[in-house]
Amino acid sequence: MTSYAASTPPAQIILSVCEGAEIAAIATGEQYKWAQSALVAAGWERTGNGVYTRLFSERAAAERAISTLVHAARRHRAAVVTSTRPYLGDIADTIAHQLPGPWTPTVEVYSHPVWQEDLVPWLWDSGELIHAVQAGQVTHATRLTNETAGVDLLLIERPGHSTGYVAGAFAPDGFDDNFENPHAPTSIVLPQDPYRAAAEIADRYLPAYHQALHARRTAAVASALSRIRDEHTELQHLTATEPDPAYEERFADMAWHEVLDVVKHAPPLIEHCRRGPLPLEDSMAMTRLEAALGTGTTIVAGWHGMLSGRPDAPRAYLNEHFPGAKAIRNRSIRPVIDAWLADGDTLLRHAHAPGRAPIPAPAAVPALPPAASKPARPR
């Protein structure tokens, strides 16, 4: 549960100076709609991300507009505060352009204090970021997304400090139970200067993030293989004393759910292991695992496609609409299971081995520009 200071106004408007003679306003508080009404009454325009803006051609016009806003805010029982920081969206734009690869910044506004709590299950962090979201008030943030690399970061102003930022990660696709996950990377405290902040993210945070992701993927595959192996051992024991097709069906049903994790998380591990030389026998094992993954991926996609979004459909539904489908699925996936039982330990041994970087070294961050030079804000 997020806690808030008793002195926090029920409705508040936070003003930040943007590039290009623009001022951004964010409405927050348990009665944030009062603040929104004041902004509308004062002639501020709401953007698609929930931020209100006004563009001014001269300082005097800006001062008059802010004075008008203050009076409107009083009528609507809202407080107006001016941030000492530049607009976070501008900072994120600069950082995104300095990071290696294609990054897209997206501003998010959490007007009501409880909205930020929706972030908690999705954040994958063991540092200051998750603490700030849980115990403080985060009125707005910026996502930095690299769809090519599958990395999604969250950037916030550092709570309790007049300068600086904090950046951490959302969990990548394919993972649940992210809260207090033992492999979670630690969010990074960033300097106020966006160019140096980008360098810190590229040089320190992203390598640590990918190392943590590699460890989590390895643990997920190891756990899945361990459960498959335990069930397979029990199957062998049961069928040795009392052969029964029902035992095989039960094993395949259980193993199917573990195969889903293997199909999701093993491909990057194999790619990781292929980055260095392998003994011939191990290389052949990797080739067999890759072939099994290809088959497994096709079976999983076909199964989910057949169910049209009902991957956990009950047996009665399957028997009615797809008689015999599960038995066919189980027979098809059995060679995939056997391949991983035979060669999975080879993958895990190399995945655990030190000496291979989880990702290629990132491209160098561009050199810092002269102090007087500043890129234009994208529109």
Residue ranges and their predicted role:
Residues 1-379:
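Compositionally biased accessory segments in Actinobacterial proteins
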